Design a protein with these regions (language model features):
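Terminal-region recognition feature
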Residues: 1-98, 102-196
Length: 196
């Protein structure tokens, strides 16, 4: 199986006239992985083994992850090539979309999808996952866009305008989601607007 995969990678390199890097995160229930800063060292090791290339192709499959890690990865790869392209066979959502937007070229199959840049924050301060009550480490991810959507619902759809009611909504939310996580949501949203 590995031998077949490596042969396919060589074929892609030949077809694209490029050096190929592969980054796949998992989305199988219970085994989900995301774009994370810890991958940068692995990419540095691979890229250091290459000389400066004319073109690098990143084969990417991901549901997303840390936006800063995605942006850092894009900048890292661009240091090692004149042309950077992303090859998407299926999904490059959220932070994967951000990586793709940083490339010179995006190549997608007919069924491939990009998605909104909607990172989910994961930290020890996130709400505990009620489906895993015996594991205090099990935390729910907090979607940046879901928090924004909650406030948009209150302000626009429900037309709540007075300061006290908005304060009560914020207090209620901060009882469910730690205030420092809410601060990270704001920071992440600002960061996304700057990058994308």
């Amino acid at each position: 199986m590995l031998k077949d995969r490596l042969e396919n990678y060589k074929k892609i390199e030949k077809l694209r006239n490029s050096k190929l890097l592969v980054y796949i995160t998992g989305d199988r229930p219970g085994f989900e992985t995301q774009i994370h800063p810890e991958i940068l060292d692995y990419f540095i090791n691979h890229l250091d083994n290459l000389k400066k290339e004319r073109k690098i192709t990143l084969l990417l499959y991901t549901r997303g992850g840390n936006t800063l890690a995605a942006w850092s990865l894009t900048n890292l790869i661009r240091q090692f090539c004149d042309e950077f392209e992303v090859l998407i066979p299926s999904k490059a959502h959220s932070s994967g979309t951000l990586i793709s937007l940083g490339a010179n070229t995006i190549i997608m199959t007919k069924q491939a999808t990009l998605g909104p840049i909607d990172p989910s924050l994961n930290s020890p301060l996130n709400p505990q996952n009620p489906q895993v009550p015996n594991n205090p480490q099990a935390r729910l991810p907090v979607s940046v866009e879901s928090i924004k959507g909650y406030f948009e619902l209150a302000k626009k759809d429900l037309q709540i305008k007075d300061t006290q009611s908005i304060a009560n909504i914020l207090i209620g939310l901060s009882n469910q989601v730690h205030p420092l996580v809410l601060g990270d949501v704001y920071r992440s949203r600002t960061h996304i607007h700057m990058l994308a």
